Amino acid sequence: MPNVNHSGYSNMAYGHSYYDYILEIYEYVHQIFPLSKNREDNFIAGHSMGGYGTIKFALTQSDKFAKAAPLSAVFQAQHFIDLDWIDFSAQSITGENTNINGTELDTYHLLNKAVENQVEIPKLLIMCGKEDFLYEDNIEFIRNLDEKKIPYTFEDSSGEHNYAYWDKAIKRAIEWFVE
């Protein structure tokens, strides 16, 4: 799994171009291994900020992925930006304007654009532990999917925002990918 630090899988205002980096990895992996580039053969998953990256790529690179599994995802990226981080500044991602609502960093904005542009959104498996601090954000996002009549599968179970939950969730996601 690629390391994107605390970039939010974004091209940072003051830092690296991690969104482009992930796209480069996608292309590189398909060049060096005998892998299909057909949409139906490619899937994406991630947990926490990686779940945010998963939904971001599912909505902006939907031609590449048939299925996407955001696990314990940060769907309200503004919450991530507003946290008081000890080891980085959100402005490294956003620049001087830390209000990301309605920007390319906002998953709701990306979803609205995808719907407006009639994008074929990948099939979604959204998973989150019921004790996860992001659980309500996940519920709010699926309500938004319901309003837009976008199909998805939602699975919740006992679990917190930790690797004990994600280990089970990624196994389930892999099973779902090959169904």
Predicted regions and their residues:
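Non-catalytic cap/lid and distal C-terminal segments of serine-dependent acyl enzymes
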Residues: 1-179
